[in-house]
């Protein structure tokens, strides 16, 4: 199947993977921070934006479809659910993923004893809003992320414009992605990956707690972890320059 992709810039290949319920347009305001140094590919995951749905939507089939669509090798940046897709792709095709940035992402989304994450009940409450009224839940989610930012209104207008330009995700894709968030456990995959890995976390993130950085560092030898002050779950939108600089520096050192 052919997934919808957009490519811009020149230089080493970078692939951006969006999160649950979104599409590649979410990166539009962030891409210019990268294209002076990198050739950036954005993709709509199956059933999101302009990409068709997969008959069998699973972490493995989605990662496989993305691998078929993007340049190889590339430095992958996975945001939220996109981090899980990137981890699975790195497991399936190590030579295709030169390095991996987990951007407010985690190998295990749901909290467990000794593992920071979102409580399962909270995740289901959050997801129910998107499943019952996607547009309203999306507005509320983005407003929460932008709250308190100096350019709050401008930021919200820009992001809403970027998201409204493509169809909303298909319900089966939302449900399948939710199952991945609830049940996937890629900690063993992360532990064994040969590629360089960094984690970028926001101190105001209410979905992926900033405390995860310490757990990731214990899990993966050599993992680089950065905490972005005042950043919510979307630091590439609220702190684009800082996020891009950390990606630049990490890739340069990989």
UniProtKB/Swiss-Prot annotation:
**Annotated substrate binding sites:** 20, 80-81, 141-145, 233
Q: InterPro entries this protein is in?
A: AB_hydrolase_1, AB_hydrolase_fold, AB_hydrolase_sf, BioH
Tell me the superkingdom of the source.
Bacteria
The residues annotated as the active site are 80, 205, 233
Q: Does the keyword Mitochondrion apply?
A: no
Pathway(s) annotated for this protein in UniProt = Cofactor biosynthesis; biotin biosynthesis
The protein in question is named Pimeloyl-[acyl-carrier protein] methyl ester esterase
Q: Which organism is it from?
A: Methylococcus capsulatus (strain ATCC 33009 / NCIMB 11132 / Bath)
Q: What is the lineage of its organism?
A: Bacteria, Pseudomonadati, Pseudomonadota, Gammaproteobacteria, Methylococcales
The coding gene here is bioH
């Amino acid at each position: 199947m052919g997934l919808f992709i957009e490519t811009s810039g020149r230089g080493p290949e970078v692939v951006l993977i969006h999160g649950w319920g979104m599409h590649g347009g979410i990166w539009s305001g962030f891409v210019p921070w990268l294209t002076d140094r990198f050739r950036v590919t954005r993709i709509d995951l199956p059933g999101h934006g302009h990409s068709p749905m997969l008959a069998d939507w699973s972490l493995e089939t989605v990662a496989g479809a993305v691998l078929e669509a993007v340049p190889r090798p590339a430095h992958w940046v996975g945001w939220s659910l996109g981090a899980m897709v990137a981890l699975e792709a790195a497991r399936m095709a190590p030579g295709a993923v030169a390095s991996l940035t987990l951007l407010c992402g985690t190998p295990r989304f749901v909290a467990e004893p000794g593992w920071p994450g979102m409580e399962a009940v909270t995740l289901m409450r959050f997801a129910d809003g998107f499943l019952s009224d996607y547009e309203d839940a999306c507005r509320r989610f983005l407003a929460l992320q932008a709250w308190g930012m100096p350019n709050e209104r401008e930021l919200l207008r820009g992001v809403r414009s970027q998201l409204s330009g493509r169809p909303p995700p298909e319900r089966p894709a939302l449900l399948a992605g939710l199952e991945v968030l609830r049940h996937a456990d890629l900690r063993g995959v992360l532990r064994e990956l040969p590629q360089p890995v960094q984690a970028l976390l926001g101190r105001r993130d209410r979905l992926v707690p900033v405390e995860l950085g310490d757990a990731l560092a214990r899990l993966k030898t050599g993992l680089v972890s950065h905490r972005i002050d005042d950043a919510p779950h979307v630091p590439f939108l609220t702190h684009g320059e800082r996020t891009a600089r950390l990606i630049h520096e990490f890739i340069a050192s990989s």
